[in-house]
A protein has these predicted regions:
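C-terminal amphipathic alpha-helical interaction region
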Residues: 325-327
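Short, low-complexity, intrinsically disordered N-terminal modules
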Residues: 1-2, 8-9, 19-21
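Short, positively charged and aromatic/hydrophobic N-terminal segments
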Residues: 13, 18-25
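Divalent-cation-assisted or electrostatically stabilized phosphate/pyrophosphate-binding catalytic cores
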Residues: 354-361
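Metal-cofactor-binding active-site regions of metalloenzymes
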Residues: 28-321, 373-375, 379-391, 395-503
Length: 503
């Protein structure tokens, strides 16, 4: 139903419309803004100026995402709206399940794409005040020119219009990246990946620069010998190093790190519950490694020790190579055994953990710093209770070599929404230097998620604009506008040291 149709509904009493209530309702509607107006989130003149004259003009530097490299290499032309919008989007899947949608209409293999899309369209009206409501409508507008409110009634028309536009070159993968002026993408890649798709991307005419990111989470799986050993077999084959002991294991990982570097990678990433507050000698690490290779699962204490040992190793090789390390800390993953067995991992059944973060993280950063082996590092918390912990941790080990060497990352995952981003921006502002912040990333598997950069930029300009209007920040366009441009793009461009496209 269109917005006009929604406005025509008038409250009734006993089945009859009260004239007084008609007048009252019409007055109420006349004072309401249109949904998603041009100045969405921009409530002051300064906010509008900062956004339209500074933020919106910046290209995108997407330094962390989960976009599939094969689809970039092949310049995929999506078959329909479900494929580009819903396939793989666990944010939407989670909302659909909460809305009572059966799993067959969420991830079912024997259900048509249209039926799953229609189930999502029926869910959208129930996502009011969830960021999915804003993101979904922004995506429809920015990519397809569809201003309709999506619901059960408008779904067929939206499906038809979107699918027609998806057949055009402008909405191929390369077209989408060009339209959004995405200058850099850093994907998320396993060390055993052959990176063939990244090699293929370099041979295309795509202006966006696409780099792999080294994500060695499986190197810590000593509590899962079957998975650990299967992965080491792949590591052995890919590195041509026979992994028989801890030393050869580290050599094989360094070999893959070097290979990633040769293809332009300058960023690593780790997803952990926390950095353990333990110590581990090389002898202890060897014992734990050998036991896992022999099929004996490590105890929780041993997992913590091995994690500490390996994370120091990864930090040192990142520092030696001039890379940036990312630490995503605090998730409890795959919390639904039923869906894990049926659908697999990473399907929208993860949540925020309450793990101790402060001591292990600060000791880790300090240890590497004391060895002169601390790389540039971006830390992300998932539990908002840790905002001030992380915002203060970054200040302990700044060494004066580059601005903002240790970064408090943008609101991650469940915090990637209006309130969560405001919390992160405010914590960083109060306890660090917001002006040196490297800004937003999509962290997404969807090519139409670049509206999240728009969302972040509008929110940032809203917050800073209000401060200017209230006399908390000087009304200096060069000073404030420059800060906005830096946060939205230029800081990341300078920080990560990657060659960028020129979109």
């Amino acid at each position: 139903m269109s917005q006009a149709g929604e406005k025509s509904r008038v409250p009734a009493e006993n089945g009859l419309v009260s004239p007084g209530r008609v007048f009252q309702f019409q007055c109420l509607m006349s004072t309401a803004k249109a949904f998603l107006p041009e100045d969405f989130l921009l409530s002051t003149e300064w906010a509008r100026t900062l956004y339209f004259e500074h933020a919106a003009k910046q290209p995108i530097f997407d330094y962390h995402c989960h976009l599939p490299p094969d689809q970039i290499a092949n310049n995929r032309q999506f078959e329909n709206l479900f494929q580009v919008w819903l396939a793989g989007d666990h944010y939407k899947w989670r909302a659909m399940r909460t809305n009572g949608v059966p799993e067959d209409l969420v991830t079912g293999k024997n259900t048509s794409d249209y039926d799953k899309f229609f189930a999502w369209a029926k869910t959208v009206p129930y996502t009011l005040r969830n960021p999915l409501y804003h993101w979904s409508h922004l995506e429809l507008r920015r990519y397809f020119g569809i201003c309709e409110i999506i619901n059960e009634q408008t779904a067929p028309k939206i499906w038809e219009i979107a699918n027609a536009k998806l057949r055009t070159p402008e909405l191929s993968v390369h077209g989408i990246l060009t339209k959004n002026r995405v200058n850099v993408i850093c994907t998320t890649d396993d060390p055993v990946d052959d990176l063939a798709h990244h090699i293929a991307i370099k041979k295309t005419k795509l202006e966006t620069r696409v780099y792999p990111t080294f994500r060695p989470d499986k190197a810590l799986w000593v509590n899962n010998p079957a998975g650990f050993n299967a992965w080491i077999d792949q590591l052995t084959a890919r590195s041509n190093i026979d992994v028989r002991d801890l030393n050869s294991f580290l050599s094989a990982l360094k070999n893959r790190h070097d290979f990633f570097h040769s293809l332009g990678a300058r960023v690593s990433d780790h997803g952990l519950e926390n950095i353990p507050d333990v110590e581990c000698t090389e002898s202890e690490a060897k014992t734990i490694f050998d036991a896992a290779r022999a099929g004996t699962a490590a105890t929780p204490e041993q997992v913590n020790k091995f994690t500490w040992f390996m994370m120091l190793f990864f930090g040192r090789i990142d520092a030696d190579a001039g890379w940036t390390k990312q630490l995503h800390l605090g998730a409890i993953r795959n919390n639904n055994t039923r869906l894990l067995k049926r659908v697999g991992a990473d399907v929208g059944v993860d949540s925020i953990g309450d793990f101790p973060q402060a001591r292990g993280l600060t000791r880790y950063l300090d240890r590497l710093d004391s060895e002169s082996k601390l790389p540039k590092t971006v830390i992300y918390n998932l539990n908002p209770a840790d905002n001030y912990v992380f915002a203060t941790a970054i200040g302990n080990v700044q060494d004066g070599t580059i601005p903002g060497k240790i970064q408090f990352g943008s609101g991650w995952w469940f915090l990637d929404q209006k309130e969560g981003m405001e919390w992160q921006i405010n914590a960083l502002s109060q306890l660090g230097l917001l002006s040196r912040f490297v800004g937003m990333l999509t962290d997404s598997r969807s090519f139409v998620s670049y509206v999240r950069h728009e969302y972040f930029r509008r929110l940032l300009c809203s917050m800073i604009g209000k401060d200017v209007e209230n006399g908390l920040i000087p009304a200096d366009r060069a000073l404030v506008g420059g800060m906005i441009e830096n946060i939205c793009y230029k800081n990341a461009q300078n920080y990560f040291g990657l060659e960028t496209g020129k979109l």
